[in-house]
């Protein structure tokens, strides 16, 4: 009984014990990223009401918006090797904040129907806005991940340094979750009370928070390392390739070969991205001791597969809005519950995550999250309703149970990078590994797109008084079942073959 009590006490107190005031400015940058969801509910409803984009088109857009996260190695190499105005950290965060602000201003222009925001169609301006914001967050994320290794006092014994590095990663994710708690319910309530334009104006506070954090942070910054041309030049060439492929997808091609190529531009970009990132990682890992190298590679593969699993897509939320009649305030309530329990879950499991093997963590994450999605499938087939249970009750309970596990999968890998990345190259290490993990999300987005093309789900779209797209949720049930089966079987089989099975 004493051991259980001690374990619970340690779980509750460890994050507090490991917090230091010198970590606070760094955590403000993570906090700003987590608080970006303050306009999330308003944006979801605005997109549904104002943009003529299908579920497949929105998923496809999400794939393209994940590409900046995939080319993080370019930003990482710049942060490691190219000071701007003598700064390797602050100026990059300032630039990122400026891009986020620019993207938000475009959203304000769209929502307020200002003439200066009509230089292109609403859909295209929205894409530009989203892209600017994403690039800004990517740049800030690269710098924050690098700083997470520089706020730790490395003059301590190595064992303590490694433990502190692990807890800085946990505290960073706690900061993101804490911000989510503070804005989750607020986002829904604001969407009920204020106009979309006003909410987007309020969200301009986000880049200000990150600017304050990076301005006051104290770091042990390594000297700039020499530019790694294969990574920087290759990354820039890859970025140009991605932009050209993205542009070409939306052009009319009379040449059949070009039309075929650009029809599958997302798939081509994914395959090229995978090859480029794996090659660059091989360059970074070549000097690592073989046993450690093998462990890092296996860990990366497992987390890649876990994050590459498909989701249901936007059709689920559309169904909840149109059929279950979930409104903005209720979505805000769900977000609030999820965010609160997410931070509690990460807090309680922090000691477990820091000390348990990654495959052990991911197995129970996979099983638990799969089981907890089953009530939502039940809602589609009216099982809770037939038992007299209200859909909102099911949604609240499901969110309450599932949310603590959403943020945990990346912490073990980030800790490994923080421990083994050499001084002067940490930004590149973080960026490349994060690029690989975000490429996994791109893979998940592609799988989601394919499933949505096979099992079509559509909301009702009216244009000029005419129904141009009818409402059809008949395929949503089978889509959710297939997604659930894939999400539980593929990661567990991968973990078994790489980490569990004896040689």
For each feature predicted by the language model, list its residue ranges:
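Intracellular loop-helix junctions on the cytosolic face of multi-pass helical membrane proteins
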Residues: 1-21, 111-128, 139, 151-312, ...
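Substrate-agnostic recognition of the 12-TM MFS/MFS-like secondary transporter fold
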Residues: 29-30, 63-75, 125-188, 309-310, ...
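Short extramembrane helix-to-coil loop segments that connect adjacent transmembrane helices in Major
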Residues: 49-57, 321-330
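Helix-to-loop junctions at the C-terminal end of transmembrane segments
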Residues: 69-87, 191, 344-364, 452
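Transmembrane alpha-helix termini and helix-breaking/packing motifs in multi-pass membrane transporters
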Residues: 77-83, 108-116, 180-201, 250-261, ...
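Primarily marks hydrophobic transmembrane alpha-helices of the MFS/SLC 12-helix fold
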Residues: 92-93, 362
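C-terminal ends and interior cores of transmembrane alpha-helices
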Residues: 94-120, 367-389
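C-terminal transmembrane helical hairpin of 12-TM major facilitator-type secondary transporters
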Residues: 360-412
């Amino acid at each position: 009984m004493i051991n259980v009590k001690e374990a619970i006490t340690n779980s509750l107190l460890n994050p507090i014990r490991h917090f230091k005031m010198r970590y606070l400015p760094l955590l403000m940058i993570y906090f700003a990223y987590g608080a970006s969801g303050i306009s999330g509910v308003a944006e979801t409803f605005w997109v549904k009401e104002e943009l003529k984009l299908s579920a497949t088109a929105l998923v496809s857009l999400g794939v393209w918006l994940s590409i900046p996260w995939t080319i993080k190695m370019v930003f990482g190499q710049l942060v490691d090797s190219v000071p701007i105005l003598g700064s390797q950290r602050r100026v990059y965060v300032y630039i990122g904040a400026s891009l986020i602000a620019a993207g938000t201003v475009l959203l304000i222009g769209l929502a307020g129907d200002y003439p200066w925001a009509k230089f292109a169609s609403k859909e295209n301006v929205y894409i530009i806005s989203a892209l600017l914001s994403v690039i800004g967050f990517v740049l800030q994320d690269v710098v924050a991940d690098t700083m997470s290794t520089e706020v730790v006092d490395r003059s301590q014994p190595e064992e303590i340094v490694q433990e502190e590095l692990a807890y800085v990663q946990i505290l960073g994710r706690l900061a993101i979750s804490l911000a989510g708690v503070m804005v989750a319910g607020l986002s829904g309530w604001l969407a009920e009370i204020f106009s979309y334009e006003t909410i987007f104006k309020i969200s301009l506070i986000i880049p200000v928070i990150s600017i304050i954090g990076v301005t006051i942070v104290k770091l042990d910054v390594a000297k700039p390392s020499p530019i790694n041309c294969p990574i920087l030049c290759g990354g820039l060439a890859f970025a140009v390739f991605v932009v050209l492929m993205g542009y070409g997808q939306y052009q009319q091609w009379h040449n059949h070969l070009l039309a075929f190529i650009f029809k599958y531009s997302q798939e081509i970009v994914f395959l090229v991205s995978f090859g480029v990132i794996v090659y660059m990682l091989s360059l970074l890992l070549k000097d690592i001791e073989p046993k450690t190298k093998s462990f890092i590679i296996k860990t990366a593969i497992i987390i890649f597969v876990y994050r590459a699993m498909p989701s249901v897509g936007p059709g689920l939320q559309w169904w909840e809005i149109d059929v279950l009649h979930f409104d903005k305030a209720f979505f805000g309530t769900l977000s609030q519950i999820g965010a609160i329990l997410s931070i509690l879950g990460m807090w309680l499991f922090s000691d477990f995550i820091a000390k348990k093997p990654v495959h052990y963590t991911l197995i129970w994450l996979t099983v638990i999250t799969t089981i907890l999605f089953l009530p939502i499938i039940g809602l589609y087939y009216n099982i809770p309703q037939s038992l007299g249970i209200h859909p909102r009750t099911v949604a609240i309970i499901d969110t309450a149970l599932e949310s603590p596990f959403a943020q945990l999968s990346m912490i073990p890998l980030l800790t490994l990078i923080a421990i083994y990345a050499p001084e002067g190259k940490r930004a590149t290490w973080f960026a490349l590994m994060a690029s690989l993990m975000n490429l996994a999300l791109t893979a998940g987005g592609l799988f989601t797109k394919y499933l949505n093309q096979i099992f079509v789900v559509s909301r009702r779209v009216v244009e000029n008084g005419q129904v141009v797209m009818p409402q059809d949720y008949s395929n949503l049930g089978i889509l959710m079942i297939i997604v659930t089966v894939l999400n539980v079987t593929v990661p567990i089989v991968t973990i078994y073959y790489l980490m569990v099975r004896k040689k």
